[in-house]
Amino acid sequence: MSKKRLYEIAKELGKESKEVVARAKELGLDVKSHSSSVEEAVAAKIAASFKPAAAPKVEAKPAAPKVSAEKKAEKSEPAKPAVAKEEAKPAEPVAPKTEKVAVKPQSRNFKAEREARAKEQAERRKQNKGNNRDQQQNGNRQKNDGRNGGKQGQSNRDNRRFNDQAKKQQGQQKRRNERRQQEDKRSNQAAPRIDFKARAAALKAEQNAEYARSSEERFKQYQAAKEALAQANKRKEPEEIFEEAAKLAEQAQQVQAVVEVVPEKKEPAVDTRRKKQARPDKNRDDYDHEEDGPRKQQKNRSSQNQVRNQKNSNWNNNKKNKKGNNKNNRNQTPKPVTERKFHELPTEFEYTDGMTVAEIAKRIKREPAEIVKKLFMMGVMATQNQSLDGETIELLMVDYGIEAKQKVEVDNADIERFFVEDGYLNEDELVERPPVVTIMGHVDHGKTTLLDTLRNSRVATGEAGGITQHIGAYQIVENGKKITFLDTPGHAAFTSMRARGASVTDITILVVAADDGVMPQTIEAINHSKAANVPIIVAINKIDKPGANPERVIGELAEHGVMSTAWGGDSEFVEISAKFNQNIEELLETVLLVAEIQELKADPTVRAIGTVIEARLDKGKGAVATLLVQQGTLNVQDPIVVGNTFGRVRAMTNDLGRRVKVAGPSTPVSITGLNEAPMAGDHFAVYEDEKSARAAGEERAKRALMKQRQATQRVSLENLFDTLKAGELKSVNVIIKADVQGSVEALSASLQKIDVEGVKVTIVHSAVGAINESDVTLAEASNAFIVGFNVRPTPQARQQAEADDVEIRLHSIIYKVIEEMEEAMKGMLDSEFEEKVIGEAVIRETFKVSKVGTIGGFMVINGKVARDSKVRVIRDGVVIYDGELASLKHYKDDVKEVTNGREGGLMIDGYNDIKMDDVIEAYVMEEIKR
């Protein structure tokens, strides 16, 4: 027998698959979904079960809504369970009890009320117990019924579910019908649609008709006004016409008589003509009060700007001014012709090279065409935008009778002009200034100890290795007079710093140790002082030592041109002991005496100028510069240009670290507020305002950059081979960080002077301040190591250096840096080796072994033959082969060497053509120290 699926049965019956599946389950069939298949007999049984259930569909008639929902429920549920009836019973006694509670007695008896409430609650509990008992009994009965007739209970539930679905479908159908009826009513009541195209066409036709009507009316009005005006002119008598002509002639004569005085404006004659009416259908603009005349019809009525432009254009004005249209201008007075003003020529003309003709014309108040004409007569072809040289401008001014002077342009960025200009200082304001004294001498001759004694402090004990690392500027008072001291380093690396100190000083104190005598840096200090034309006071120090010999020192100095006044020279000699404060007062008196002879003067009223003694980069303050004021007075908040930098003086401290607001001539101060750290030895100057200072500083920085670029060497035929050779050199990349700018300069110069053949030093970067992360990053990128002089790396930089394997060398003594750098440079050189013969042997017998090679039996005749040595095979005085030993044996034992007079066997690596009487020469390569 064939089978059918449930969805096929549903399709035949016109039912949903869900209903068919539910009916099959009601009939007790084991089906799961609409895809389940059943026998044809079962399918016929399912189809037959739907035939009596077709009656509920009739309820969708119009009479159905009249039946109430309660009756429908009664019909659809013919047999309600007994539990429902018993549930309705407890509701009957509730109503009378609520009525009793609602009626309140006049005097409340709370006790009676509590008793009544207690009785009510007891009755409710009894009723609930009875109901619960009945429900349990009914539930037990239902369970028994379910056990006895499970199929019947299942069919009742399915019937109820089916009835609910039928009711739901009827409600949905009813709502759909009502919705359709409402839509039909709305469609019947809606107004007819408007035909917008027809409406727009009708409106446009009405507008065109109205416009045509108004245009005709305006044209008729214009014609009527024109005819009325013509008739009025005809009516005038000839006498009136002659009177008007006479008035016009008088007015013309008055206008010609007036040349400089402008005539008063007369009111124009009243126009008796009928005024033209404006268009009634167009609003007039507020700013346009002219009247419209007759116009042709325009297609584009909405373009009001087009009409306005036509009315205000030159074309309309020209049209009005044509012949025959001048009737309106008859009574208007002509404007007087203004004469051109005459400008007198200047007596002097200050010019610069490259001025154009237009600029000259503007300055002398003449037309450029006039000047071009004069130049043409002089034989110079020029236009108004062409530049002229100074000679042509002078010839042109001679032609005009003007005295020409060339303008001298002042370079605002030139600071050095303040030091050489004669008119910068006021001779009447000059006052005596303190002397600037520089202490010079060789290393460890006692310069800083002397200065320490003068200042009563212990600066010298803090100096590393007994070397002063940078210039210090201090000021002391002796007998009520100030003396400024500059301390210079004595090491050879600080030559530039000593030269800088000599350039700003007035007196040089040359410190020479009585036990050491004249040293190389002593001679250098003498040369610097002589070059600067500075008087020298010789302080022979350490006279307290047993080996002191001042006379020898005086003789050695005389050999170098420093003669004592006792010997007929001009240098003062003072024997002192800086350590024990011996003869210090005599030295200071000598300084004041020499300063008095020099008559040192300064003008404190001008803007301050001076020199940078030292500069550094402070972590908290930024750029800090030590300045020596040479002329003028430096104040806080002064705009200043220092070298190639600029700024404003924010704070100023003296040599004791105290803040000051004013610094006079010969006063050393430290300032902050610069945008960068300047170079030591740069000049500084105070400007009028910050704007000019900024412009000068930026211009100086720009010039310095251009100069640096121009100084870059270019490859030429002369240095081409040197450049190629330099490419073969090895370089040591170094980053230098120091505490002050002078130390940076000294280190850079010293490292670049180190002469190691084949290796050169490359300064990748040098700056003032602590070693930071950017320095470590640069060192890693350029394969360099960092040299820190009197500075320390930050914690972050130290961690980064350890992570990136960057070497940081910290030093406080400059000659140790130089020695360490020399060793590093020598270590970078390729090792050089020299050949050394260690022994000779003669082959006495040869043995050929298969799969091994030729073994040579030998005897050492000189020196020794080592296993790790190289050998040469010499036959008849000619080297046949040069190689290494493969094995070396003494009898059957492997040995490291065979000494003189002994026998052994050897095999040469890669060579088997050994013959008797061959000489084996053993040698090694030894490294040569450089």
Swiss-Prot record:
Among SUPFAM superfamilies, the record links this protein to: Initiation factor IF2/eIF5b, domain 3 (SSF52156), P-loop containing nucleoside triphosphate hydrolases (SSF52540), Translation proteins (SSF50447)
GO MF, any single term: GTP binding
- State where composition is biased (Low complexity): 50-67, 129-141, 309-318
Q: Which PROSITE patterns match?
A: G_TR_2, IF2
- Residue ranges of the region described as Disordered: 50-217, 260-346
Q: Where is this region: G1?
A: 441-448
UniProtKB keywords: Cytoplasm, GTP-binding, Initiation factor, Nucleotide-binding, Protein biosynthesis
Extract the InterPro entries matched here.
Answer: EF-G-like_DII, IF2_II, IF2_N, P-loop_NTPase, Small_GTP-bd, T_Tr_GTP-bd_dom, TF_IF2_bacterial-like, TIF_IF2
Protein family according to the UniProt entry: Belongs to the TRAFAC class translation factor GTPase superfamily. Classic translation factor GTPase family. IF-2 subfamily.
Listed name of the protein: Translation initiation factor IF-2
